[in-house]
Every structure is written in C-alpha cells, then in structure tokens.
Amino acid sequence: MQRQKIRIRLKGFDHRVLDVSTREIVNTAKRTGAQVLGPIPLPTRLEKFTVLRGPHIDKKSREQFEIRTHKRVLDIVDPTPQTVDALMKLDLAAGVDVEIKL
C-alpha cells in the first residue's frame, strides 16, 4: 500500500518569519501524531535591480536593490484526519506563502 504524503512548500522574504511558521507547522503535525520530514531549506532566490540614482545625467552613478526569496519544504508522512484539520485551522504570518500538494 502506498503511503500518503503531504508536501508543504513555504516562501517568504524574511527568513525569521518563515522559520517561525515552519516551526508552528511541525509542532502541529507532531502533536496530532504525524511523522514530519524536514524542514528542508531550498536555495534562496536572489533578484537584483539596478537603477540610476539621478533623474537626468550621470549614468555612472547607480544604485542596486535586491529581493531575497527564502524557501522551505516539509513532508508530512501518513497524516491523520486530525492533522489535516489542525493544519487547515492554523493561522500563519502574513509574509509567508504556503503551497500544499497531496
């Protein structure tokens, strides 16, 4: 018989908020009797933007901005119905994007 697995992928710009949300999910899953694999940190996506500092001339004067997107993956193996209910009721931070695959 094939084991059922829930894969949860979290994305966020602030790694501290992401780690807190990950910890909440892990604690909730373990409390309801499911086995958790992870969290596995995935590579951080670094996006850089270069803009001119002044509006007129001076092409040599530029400024760089960057956005870092941190990612984590959790696998919940053989979840119980209580685990699924608890995860649906879980309220996570606003800066975290959650993607769930069954």
Curated annotation (Swiss-Prot):
InterPro entries hit by this protein: Ribosomal_uS10, Ribosomal_uS10_CS, Ribosomal_uS10_dom, Ribosomal_uS10_dom_sf
The keyword Ribosomal protein belongs to this UniProt entry's keyword annotation: yes
Keywords: Ribonucleoprotein, Ribosomal protein
PROSITE patterns reported in the protein's UniProt record: RIBOSOMAL_S10
Gene Ontology molecular-function annotations: structural constituent of ribosome; tRNA binding
Pfam short name (any one): Ribosomal_S10
Biological process per Gene Ontology, one example term: translation
GO cellular component, one term: ribosome
Assigned protein family: Belongs to the universal ribosomal protein uS10 family.
Assembly and oligomerization: Part of the 30S ribosomal subunit.
Function: Involved in the binding of tRNA to the ribosomes.
Protein name: Small ribosomal subunit protein uS10
UniProt source species: Parvibaculum lavamentivorans (strain DS-1 / DSM 13023 / NCIMB 13966)
Gene: rpsJ
